Amino acid sequence: MNDFWQHCSALLERELTPQQYVTWIKPLAPVAFDASANTLSIAAPNRFKLDWVKSQFSGRIADLAREFWNTPIEVQFVLDPKAGMRGAPAGVAPAAPRMPLTPNGPAAAVAAIAANLTAHASAAPSAPADVPLTPSAAAAHHLHGDDADIDLPSLPAHEAAAGRRTWRPGPGAAPANGAEADSMYERSKLNPVLTFDNFVTGKANQLARAAAIQVAHNPGISYNPLFLYGGVGLGKTHLIHAIGNQLLLDKAGARIRYIHAEQYVSDVVKAYQRKAFDDFKRYYHSLDLLLIDDIQFFSGKSRTQEEFFYAFEALVANKAQVIITSDTYPKEISGIDDRLISRFDSGLTVAIEPPELEMRVAILMRKAQSEGVNLSEDVAFFVAKHLRSNVRELEGALRKILAYSKFHGREISIELTKEALKDLLTVQNRQISVENIQKTVADFYNIKVADMYSKKRPANIARPRQIAMYLAKELTQKSLPEIGELFGGRDHTTVLHAVRKIADERGKDAQLNHELHVLEQTLKG
């Protein structure tokens, strides 16, 4: 095991930049090798490094292990705080660095962030890293008994004095270790794996992604706030983490915080109980970027809404960026103060729709590739055709397929996929029917269901009928002729015209897009 790790470390040191090697590989340590099960366990000193190494380097380490032992090896990663103190195994000779395997990839990006952080730290060497907290802040940070902490990272001295941080990006020497990067992500609560590079883009989310990139490069200037809405599992959280990660790359030292709305509510309650609102406000009002997820959880919580309103006003006044996500359009969120709704509407509001077929296929293929599995296109198309709601559902289905294949020792095929997803496919087929779509659309537009089959052509009937045809094509497995038959025996070309017309207008008409979003969410329950 140790011989392999020396061999593996030496090769990775040649393949990676010195910064990448020191930050990600050197802190790892092999802890166990089970020859009977062909498993190798590698320890990482913290969760951040474990998640990053697992996502970025596990495939390469597994390849090297297979070459070394001449058999497939399953590489497992475990947490061990002492791993970072072990360093690289003795006897590993220094190697001349080569160009990184992925110079523009996420690992290189974090290395660049860490380098910028060192430059930022060296710009003010006399300032201490942290200052003692006030008594109320100490109460907020160090609680005992059943109470959890108010999740407010401490402010560096020069930030506490100035009220908010000044960005000081710039090149610098690589740090001796990844401690700065660890601290940066711990404070921001960002997931470094969620980047623009691994966000699968299609028609359903291309506007949201374009807006997110614009905001990431020009925070506080364009689209403030940026409000993203859509159903669960469509990529809202991925996008806002990607914005934060990109801003850290562009402007090292930016004060960023990702927080779920439920955690924000909890922090408000605890600050109220401990009379620690001064510290609470000082922290949230001094951010450069606030990313708040699922703001619909603020519904009915007046004190939380009041505190968020003050934070929002302070941040926008300071040209800090605010990004918000929700499961629905701002004006559709119940129990939210009108003045907050008006602030949400003052920026850019963008919907993220369920992924279209091609995008679903791309998501499945990329996820399978990240799992080291060669998924055939016919299997990917089969799954994508039957599962339409969101990315999480697709990824969950793929995990079921992979597990079923492994447990039964069979190659992945369409037949195996049907067996693995039998229950899921049955539920999907039972949930949405053309008849249900017709009734839902008729109720929504206040027309009779019989109008769906009739030959009437006034606009107030023809338009909902076209929308129902479009939804039938998108949400069921019916063919165009079958859909036409269910709409009063219409020709398949009529259905095709309706589908193309609504699909085209959806991308141009915000009101139509919103109505379709509401209908889709209603039909999917």
UniProtKB/Swiss-Prot annotation:
Gene3D superfamilies, per database record: 1.10.1750.10, 1.10.8.60, 3.30.300.180, P-loop containing nucleotide triphosphate hydrolases (3.40.50.300)
SMART domains assigned: AAA, Bac_DnaA_C
Keywords: ATP-binding, Cytoplasm, DNA replication, DNA-binding, Lipid-binding, Nucleotide-binding
CDD domains reported for this sequence: AAA (cd00009), Bac_DnaA_C (cd06571)
Entry-linked InterPro entries: AAA+_ATPase (IPR003593), Chromosome_initiator_DnaA (IPR001957), Chromosome_initiator_DnaA-like (IPR020591), Chromosome_initiator_DnaA_CS (IPR018312), DnaA_C (IPR013159), DnaA_dom (IPR013317), DnaA_N_dom (IPR024633), DnaA_N_sf (IPR038454)
Residues covered by region (Disordered): 160-181
Subcellular location: Cytoplasm
Biased composition regions of type Low complexity, renumbered to the chain: 169-181
Region (Domain III, AAA+ region): 189-405
GO biological process, one term: regulation of DNA replication
Region of interest (Domain I, interacts with DnaA modulators), ranges: 1-71
UniProt-annotated stretches for the region Domain II: 71-188
UniProt-recorded Gene Ontology molecular function terms: ATP binding; ATP hydrolysis activity; DNA replication origin binding; lipid binding
A GO term from the CC aspect: cytoplasm
UniProt: ATP binding residues: G233, G235, K236, T237
Superkingdom as given in the UniProt entry: Bacteria
Keyword Endoplasmic reticulum carried by entry: no
Region: Domain IV, binds dsDNA, residue numbers: 406-525
Pfam families assigned: Bac_DnaA, Bac_DnaA_C, DnaA_N
Comment field on protein domains: Domain I is involved in oligomerization and binding regulators, domain II is flexibile and of varying length in different bacteria, domain III forms the AAA+ region, while domain IV binds dsDNA.
Subunit relationships: Oligomerizes as a right-handed, spiral filament on DNA at oriC.
PANTHER family xrefs: CHROMOSOMAL REPLICATION INITIATOR PROTEIN DNAA
HAMAP family: DnaA_bact
Family: Belongs to the DnaA family.
Purpose of the protein: Plays an essential role in the initiation and regulation of chromosomal replication. ATP-DnaA binds to the origin of replication (oriC) to initiate formation of the DNA replication initiation complex once per cell cycle. Binds the DnaA box (a 9 base pair repeat at the origin) and separates the double-stranded (ds)DNA. Forms a right-handed helical filament on oriC DNA; dsDNA binds to the exterior of the filament while single-stranded (ss)DNA is stabiized in the filament's interior.
Name the UniProt record assigns to this protein: Chromosomal replication initiator protein DnaA
Organism: Burkholderia vietnamiensis (strain G4 / LMG 22486)
Lineage of origin: Bacteria, Pseudomonadati, Pseudomonadota, Betaproteobacteria, Burkholderiales
